[in-house]
């Protein structure tokens, strides 16, 4: 649900929407927005995080108002990535594609892996998070602290993505991409 004190302007993003004058809330359909709103309405623990007004920054480019969304306190993860992971996993569970006990897999450089691990544990799944060798040990430790098995992959993030996808395919695990 929208904050009654906040007004947003959405520009039609497609030629047909602009031509028809159809109100549009952004990049997604009304059904997609409704689905997301219903998801959050049923989960009070995922309540909206604070919006902080930044008037000095707003004045510089001549904006009326500039608000920053503060996700630093969301489950102690200090990242917004939890919302996307939680929504994606919830949708897969609702569709029957993921069940408690399943193994969820992702490649990450940090926050997405931690969000998948946190959510997997919350819904009774296991998580395997594939990290490139360049990911700092404290990030890997933070992911492991959420209950994930951390798999180090030689090379880059793209190499970790390939290995995660290959192992998920081989073992019948579910990939949660960011």
Language model: regions and residue ranges:
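PLP-dependent amino-acid enzyme catalytic core
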Residues: 1-178
């Amino acid at each position: 649900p929208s904050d009654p004190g906040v007004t947003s302007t959405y520009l039609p993003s497609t030629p047909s929407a602009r031509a028809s004058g159809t109100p549009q809330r952004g990049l997604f359909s009304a059904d997609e927005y409704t689905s997301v709103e219903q998801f959050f309405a049923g989960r009070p623990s995922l309540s909206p995080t604070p919006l902080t007004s930044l008037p000095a920054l707003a004045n510089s480019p001549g904006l009326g108002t500039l608000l920053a969304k503060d996700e630093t306190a969301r489950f102690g993860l200090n990242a917004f990535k939890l919302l996307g992971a939680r929504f994606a996993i919830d949708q897969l569970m609702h569709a029957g594609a993921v069940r408690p006990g399943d193994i969820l897999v992702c490649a990450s450089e940090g926050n997405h892996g931690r969000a998948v691990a946190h959510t997997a544990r919350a819904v009774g799944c296991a998580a395997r998070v594939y990290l490139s060798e360049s990911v700092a040990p404290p990030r890997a430790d933070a992911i492991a602290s959420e209950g994930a098995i951390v798999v180090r992959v030689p090379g880059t993030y793209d190499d970790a993505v390939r290995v995660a996808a290959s192992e998920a395919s081989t073992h019948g695990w579910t990939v949660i991409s960011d």
